Amino acid sequence: SSDLVAYADMQYCQQKLGTRFVMHADASHYRHQFTIDGVDYDLSQNKDDEAMAAYAKWIVNQVLEPGLDGVDVDWEGWSSSDLVRLIKELGKYFGPEGEQPDKLLIVDYFSGTPPTDIIPYCDYIVQQAYSNQVGFLTQPSNFPPEKMIYCESFGVFYADGGQLMNYARWEPSKGRKGGCGVFFLGRNYYSSSGIPYNEFREAIQIMNPAISE
């Protein structure tokens, strides 16, 4: 089936190319219902400490069962305090402070900067954009630049890379950013250059130039 082919592709990329795949989890007003250890939860009705710990455990299971490399928590809607509680729970398992530090713990956000309390527990914090622009890029106060990843939305500009190259070139005034990215990356397969993923490949070379021996 197509699912088996996709799973085999993921494993090949993990094992041969070093690509890491993470689960998308919500800290927003979606996907609030889940079951763990035979108990049903609905975070839209109750986000007490027990429910938050259960949500973290459910996420961990979703990551480990298929062999993913971590989780990206999409923060768009929850309060800052609820996000911190979830990340502290997830941080017991994944990320720099977790039982399995090789598993990535990432938070992504759009408008308001997340609370700095999450920093020790996270490998990366991703700043998203929903437009084809670069001028707004800023390093958020008190966040380590090496943990920050800046992502834009291709929209209809996937054929020439949109602002991806500018994102790759941009650096904060102090330090070096953790990286950049786009949504959806797959669209750049149809690069107007005729080379699949041409602009994305160039962005990688800008940030991590190949070494000539």
Regions found by a protein language model. Name each.
Residues 2-167, 174-177, 185-206:
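Chitinase-like catalytic core of GlcNAc-active glycosidases
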Residues 205-213:
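C-terminal domain-boundary segment and adjacent tail
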